[in-house]
Amino acid sequence: MASDNGKSFLDKFAEVSAKVGNQVHLRSLRDAFATITPLYILAGIAVLINNVVFPLFPLDAAGLANLQTWGSAITLGTLNVSAIILAGLIGYSLAKNKRFDNPLACMVVAISAFVIMMPQQITATLAATSPLLTDKITSAEVTGALSTANTGTNGLFSAIIIALLSVSLFIKISGVEKLKVKLGEGVPPAVSNSFNVMIPMLLNLAVFALAAALLAVCAGTDLCTIISTCISNPLKSIMNAGPWAVILIYTLANLLFCVGIHQSTISGATVEPILTMLIVDNMATFADGGTIQPDHYMNMQIVNSFALIGGSGCTLMLLLDTLLFSKNKASETVSKMAILPGLFNINEPVIYGYPIVYNLPLMIPFVLLPDLFIGITYGLTCAGIISPCIAQVPWTMPPVINALLATGFDWRAGVWQAIEIVIGMAVYLPFMKISEKAIAKQEALAE
């Protein structure tokens, strides 16, 4: 009876979690971040080469600056416009997930609405060669320009909210038949679709322009600043108040994986967008020669590199234990097939083939080991024992190399990741033995 109640609770938990993960706006957000991730990885590689590799060359300051123009150009086209790109991707993904027949129009609306809500006047720092620069005058108010503070990494949260609002409103208005322009049956579909959304698009952007004007005239501010102050900064602060919020979400997410539903259903729709923003901030800071602050030590890369070794639940350690110490032929067979994908952090064969799903002994280290590593790695970073993550690297990068790249080639991070593997093997081993004994008893009863 107790077992049935426990399973019933897990089933209900999985059902609720699946509904949360499949919520259309959260799913669209997850899809958009998945699409933009290669751009962030390219930016991370450029940041590493620009700030770690190029300075090793025997060049004077001018020569190094010329060489670093390459990486700066990549930063300009990736990190510095990432909010604009993300806004468009969210608009497109939301349209696809809502099965709207003109997703490109939604992309246009999202980008336009986002730019409309930006400040029309920005403060720019004067260059060292500017004739206007004096001891008292170091900046100037500029109109007709966009600030990378809004178009880049700092504007990601504004892009998310404005894109979701504008596209949701646009899709709603587009459903009103009276607002569609009928051109007749002989008109090509592409032309007809563009005219169908013309009036809804005009109305939508007019509403956002009115809101921007009212905020500027009546309050002397803009929506991007309000979102950053009231929503983005507090949420980032919660993520960096300690590892506890991240640990809680990944505990729930890995519990979900234990009943057969992918952990990204929860983590991908909740904390990962915020954690991704934090590592993107770190890349921009490092590219500018700045120092990573403690409130950015917790980010997506610290989770990927140090808490997902071999994939969710750090299952690479289980595979190594099985190959070295197991006497169960079925487990050995699965491990031999899964070890190569596991080295590249792909572990679905382990989750469903070993299996982890509904295997109570293995569920315990699967859930708790990543939590342990998140907490310890965060503590080591705060203590200055390992460097903070400054680059987003491909999640399929093998262990040790992964940690070295993420921290700007800090050898201590690579050593710590190797130690994690040893710790993980020690933690998994007794639970693997218990699981094998349980399987042996079940097989004996079946006979």
Kindly give the residue locations of the regions a language model identified.
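Hydrophobic alpha-helical transmembrane segments
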Residues: 73-86, 151-158, 239-259, 294-313, ...
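Juxtamembrane interface elements at the cytosolic ends of transmembrane helices
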Residues: 3-12, 165-186, 210-227, 266-267, ...
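Membrane-embedded translocation segments of transport machinery
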Residues: 212-218, 222-326
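Core transmembrane alpha-helical segments of multi-pass membrane transporters/permeases
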Residues: 24, 28-49, 157-160, 164-168, ...
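Cytosolic juxtamembrane amphipathic/interface segments immediately preceding
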Residues: 10-33, 67-68, 183-195, 349-351
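Transmembrane alpha-helical segments and their short flanking loops
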Residues: 2-20, 59-68, 130, 139-140, ...
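Transmembrane alpha-helical segments in integral membrane proteins
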Residues: 82-97, 163-173, 252-259, 265, ...
